[in-house]
A protein has these predicted regions:
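Short acidic, hydrophobic short linear motifs in intrinsically disordered regions
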Residues: 98, 110-123, 148-150, 304-316
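Basic, low-complexity terminal or inter-domain segments flanking catalytic cores
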Residues: 43, 84, 131-132, 153-579
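C-terminal accessory/connector segments of nucleic-acid motor ATPases
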Residues: 44-66, 100-137, 448, 513
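Short glycine-/polar-rich loops that comprise or flank the Walker A/P-loop
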Residues: 144-145
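Conserved short loop/turn motifs at secondary-structure junctions
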Residues: 18-22, 103-112, 122-127, 150-159, ...
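Phosphate-backbone binding and catalysis cores of DNA-processing enzymes
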Residues: 1-103, 197-254, 259
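Positively charged, polyanion-binding regions of nucleic-acid-associated proteins
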Residues: 93-109, 294-300
Length: 579
């Protein structure tokens, strides 16, 4: 089914939008996730707000810090300085009393042993491996006999595996670290349970010496799998949790914290970042009066949604029931290769062609890239695999609707067919033939191309001008500590009031704004800029200026000194490489 969908829609996309494009039942949904997140980030407007912290002490002079969370039973989140100053003036004059104070013991259980998806996520977050690298290394470990099969949805462990893990814990860590009962993890419905969870094959046979003979990347992945396997049979981590609520007239203040009492499984699988959240707080009596030391306001700004990384994209696909362990690598590889998305610092950014393809599929094949439909179809395919559904019935129901929509999409846009990816004519003259340049969007990016190339004439002009996306420029000028909001302010289309995409015209360094609805809307703006003088650096060989250039391998800096011609590659992490 997936192959037929791809074979039928992909030629249509190539004809209507651009060459080299493809669509698929799962890959198109993955692109849609990235595009929707991209648009939320673009449309996000940061808002100022304030947090207010009160530094108090009790009768024994033990200090504690609480946040003012409520005023008159409503969340306290003032959006300007005047309101925060008014609150400070009131709080300075009133008393603080404890209205709630309790402590309790909490436990944190270990996660299940790895499935394919959770291994990909953990390796991405903990080891910074992309999922393609993770699966390649896992394949090598499996072929060498170090781990069990690495394509599985199951968290199930055999009894032999459980015994093996528990014997290791007892021997290495002692009885206090061994969970009192065997931990057995259940699976979701319709998952591929032909294999166990991913685990070391035989930890008693595979010595540390053998592991050390592996390449470092393979060692790290094996150790991650090993540690998670052992951790799943260890004792829970034990915390002392304390919660304190204080009242001051109409205001409520709150703080909480936990202290690690026993590490348990964390001993072998340490938490990342500040997840321990150790915060020692005094035990207070209800009704106890506290003394104010000081009040500190903290200016904050709301933040846009976080971009997907490979781990979070796989997690979101898994959460929505889309795709299977064996498909995640090919999905992400395909959407990158087609030019729909690209990654910077392991974060996904939607490219313009990805937005256009998503919009056209949404218009012509809305069911195909619906999250619910894709998950339901995935479930039906699983039922077919276990003979609970007849495959012809499932496919016939789908293809009857699909073929009808395909025939409509093939029609001319005037007759309700899929919209074309039209080029938008601009007022910019071609430097070669003096005809007008037009905005073009393909799988390789957005650029200006001469309009005579599309005319029915013998000598077609192939002149093009590259457009550098705002993101790439901001990455470069970070080296000069410039304020990006002054250099590249957000603009709205004068035709439809949509947020405009920002580019720099290569060679001119003028700012070029294109309507976010392009090519359906032909709105654009050109603004002069001094970026030509900003995007420079000194050559370390001859001290001449170096200017931004574009090559087939990306952006780089080139020395203008003809006798030097030194180049410096601009790294993906936005920094200019040092010689």
């Amino acid at each position: 089914m997936d192959r037929i969908i791809g074979y039928m829609i992909s030629p249509l996309l190539c004809k209507k939008i651009s060459r080299g494009l493809s669509a698929g039942r799962v890959q198109s949904v993955a692109v849609k996730l990235v595009v929707e997140r991209e648009r939320k980030i673009k449309s996000f407007v940061s808002e100022e707000y304030y947090k207010l912290y009160a530094y108090l002490k009790n009768s024994k002079n033990l200090p504690l810090t609480l946040q003012v969370t409520h005023k008159k039973e409503k969340i306290f989140k003032p959006k300007n300085k005047n309101k925060i100053k008014l609150a400070i003036d009131i709080l300075k004059k009133i008393d603080f009393f404890v209205i709630n104070s309790f402590e309790k013991i909490t436990f944190s259980k270990p996660s299940a042993p790895f499935t394919t998806a959770t291994l990909q996520q953990a390796a991405n977050v903990r080891l910074n491996y992309n999922i393609k690298k993770t699966m390649l290394l896992a394949q090598q470990l499996y072929e060498a006999g170090y781990i069990t099969y690495m394509r599985t949805d199951s968290t199930h462990l055999s009894q032999d595996a459980i015994n093996m893990a528990r014997e290791y814990i007892l021997k290495v860590f002692g009885k206090s670290y061994l969970s009192k009962k065997e931990r057995k993890y259940t699976n979701k419905n319709n998952l591929q349970e032909a294999h166990e969870a991913i685990r070391p094959s035989y930890i008693n046979i595979i010595s540390e010496k053998k592991i050390k003979n592996l390449k470092l990347d393979a060692q790290n992945l094996y150790n991650l799998i090993f540690n998670q396997f052992i951790a799943c049979q260890m004792m829970s981590a034990k915390y002392n949790f304390i919660n304190i609520t204080v009242k001051a007239d109409n205001f409520k203040l709150h703080t909480s914290g936990r202290t690690l009492l026993f590490d348990g499984w964390i001993k072998i699988m340490p938490l990342l970042g500040q997840h321990y959240n150790d915060k020692i707080l005094p035990i207070l009596k209800i009704g106890e009066k506290l003394k104010l030391i000081k009040l500190i306001p903290n200016q904050c700004f709301t933040k846009p949604p976080v971009r997907y990384c490979e781990a979070s994209l796989v997690k979101e696909l898994e959460k929505k029931g889309i795709g299977r362990p064996s498909t995640y690598v090919s999905i992400i590889t395909t959407i990158k290769n087609r030019g729909y998305v690209h990654t910077i610092d392991n974060r996904f950014y939607a490219k313009k062609i990805g937005e256009i393809v998503t919009d056209r599929l949404e218009e012509s094949f809305n069911e195909l890239i619906s999250y619910d439909f894709t998950a339901k179809m995935e479930n039906n395919l699983d039922l077919i695999a276990i003979n609970q559904q007849y495959w012809k019935n499932v496919l016939n129901i789908f293809f009857k609707k699909f073929l009808q929509k395909l025939e409509i999409a093939k029609k001319d846009p005037k007759d309700g067919g899929m919209q074309l990816n039209k080029s938008v004519i601009t007022d910019i003259d071609c430097s070669i033939c003096k005809k007008k340049m037009m905005i073009c969007t393909t799988s390789t990016g957005v650029f200006l191309g001469c309009s005579s190339y599309t005319m029915n004439i013998k000598e077609k002009c192939k002149n093009t001008i590259n457009l550098i996306p705002k993101l790439e420029i901001l990455n470069i000028i970070k080296n000069f500590n410039l304020k990006k909001d002054i250099l590249l302010p957000q603009q709205y289309c004068h035709n439809c009031n949509t947020i405009m995409d920002c580019y720099i015209i290569y060679g001119q360094h003028n700012i070029f704004y294109i309507c976010g609805k392009n090519p359906l809307c032909n709105g654009y703006k050109i603004k002069k800029s001094n970026l030509n003088h900003i995007i420079t650096t000194k050559c370390k060989k001859c001290s001449y200026n170096m200017y931004l250039k574009q090559g087939c391998f990306g952006n780089y800096m080139l020395c203008i000194n003809d006798t030097c011609k030194n180049t410096i590659k601009i790294l993906s992490k936005s920094d200019i490489a040092t010689l």
